[in-house]
Structures are given as C-alpha cells and as structure tokens.
C-alpha cells in the first residue's frame, strides 16, 4: 500500500510552472527507477532529481497502520521516510543535497541508497526543460536532456 506523494509533488510543480510566464518545465514522475537509472538519465546531464529514501539512510520501520477513508484500503506507514535531491555519484557513493540536520551535500554508499529507496517505493520526480517550440503543446518526450 502506498500514497503517491511524488504525484502530488509532480502535479504542484507542473501547476506552478504553468502559472509563471517564460518558465517552460515539466515535472516527470520517475517512480520505479533506481538511483543508477536516475543518475544516467538526469543527474549526469546536470539535472538533479527529487528522491525519496530514509532519513540518514536509517532502517525503515513499519507502522502505524490505518484504513483510508475514501477507498477503505489499509495503509501502512513506512517510518524514517525522507526526501532529498539526488545530485551526483561516483564509483562508491550517491550524493544528495540534504538540508536535514545541516548535512548540505552528503554521500551514501550506493547499495545502501538503493535499498532505502526501495523501502520507500522508489519514489522520484524529475523537472525537465521543454523545448521552446513545444512549450504550448507540452507533449511528453519534448524535454531536453
């Protein structure tokens, strides 16, 4: 069971860019992608990615559990959820801009990051620039990478 926070973030980013003149970006839900895939597609091209994992890469903890009013579905919260900005990688680590506890830019071992990202349902959002001649159409796939 999961709540799609990344969709809410993506929708809000899209609404914001559509209301401001001369800003031509699109929020892309990249949930389900590994950190490695996100680095290859975006970060290696200078575009950071909003990324969910666990705070300080702590172990995820299950609970509490409740029933969602609208659907009746049972929802289980995964504690230690944390969102940060994936900004880089080297052979051993992924690097994040993380304001938590004054971290600034911090690196974590790749295997640990992938595990904690998986624990939070591999949620991620990218913000991509749309090519000028496609701004009004806003077609998927017209972003610059």
Indicate residue ranges for each PLM-predicted region.
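Structural recognition of the beta-strand scaffold that forms the well-ordered cores
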Residues: 24-27, 49-53, 85, 95-97
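Noncatalytic regulatory segments and standalone regulatory/sensor domains
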Residues: 44, 57-59, 63-78, 83-145
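Cysteine-nucleophile protease catalytic domains, especially the papain-like/related folds used
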Residues: 1-48, 121-145
């Amino acid at each position: 069971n999961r709540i799609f926070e990344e969709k809410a973030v993506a929708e809000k980013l899209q609404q914001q860019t559509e209301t401001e003149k001369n800003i031509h970006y699109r929020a892309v839900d990249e949930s389900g992608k590994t950190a490695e895939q996100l680095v290859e597609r975006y970060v290696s091209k200078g575009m950071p990615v909003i990324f969910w994992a666990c705070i300080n890469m702590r172990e995820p903890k299950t609970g509490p559990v409740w029933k969602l009013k609208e659907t009746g579905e049972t929802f289980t919260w995964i504690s230690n959820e944390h969102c940060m900005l994936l900004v880089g990688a080297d052979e051993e680590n992924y690097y994040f801009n993380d304001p938590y506890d004054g971290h600034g830019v911090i690196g974590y071992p790749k295997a640990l990051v992938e595990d904690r990202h998986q624990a939070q349902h591999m949620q991620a959002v990218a913000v991509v620039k749309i090519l000028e001649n496609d701004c009004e159409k806003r077609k998927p796939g017209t972003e610059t990478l």
